[in-house]
Amino acid sequence: RCTRTLRSGVSRVREAACWSRHSKNQVGAARERQGRNACSTHLIVDAQSVKNTDTAAFKGYDAGKQVSGIKRHIAVDTQGLPHAVAVTTAEVTDRKGALQALQRCKCGLKQVQSLLCDSGYVGRPFEQGVQEILGEHITVQIAKRSELHSFKVMPKRWIVERSFAWLEKNRRLWKNC
C-alpha cells in the first residue's frame, strides 16, 4: 500500500515536470507549425486594466482608465502569441509592469531584437531597463498616432489588442475574482 502511494506520487511529479516542459514549448511549437523560427525577434508590448470583484485579494486603482482591479502586461510576437506575461495591481505603471514581464520571462527572449510599444512606454528609463534585462542590442520603437483625436488603426499594434481580445473571450478571465 505504501509503495503504491509512493509510486503514484512519483508518477504525478514526473507528469507535472513533463507538462511544465510541454507548456513552455507551446509557443515555439506553434510558431514552427506556421513555418517560423521557435524564438521571435520582434515583440509588441501592451497592458490592459481589468475590473476586480470586491472580494478579490489583489487590486489597485488605475487612475488613467478609472478601473479598480488588476493590470495584465503582455509581450506578443507578430502572430499574437504571448512570450512574456505579468499580472500586477492596477496602479502599477505600464512601464514597470512590462519590465516585470520581461524579467520573468527573459530566458525565453534571448533572440529578441526589437520591441514595439505605444506612447505609454515613452522614456529613456524604460529603454534602459529593457536593455539591462534583454541586452544592449534591443531597440525600443514607440508607435505614435499622427492625429490627436482621430481613430486610426496603427500597423502591428492591433496584434497585441487582438491577443487581449482572445483573453477576454475566455469567460473565466472576464473579471478577476
Label the model's feature ranges.
Residues R1-C177:
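Short alpha-helical elements
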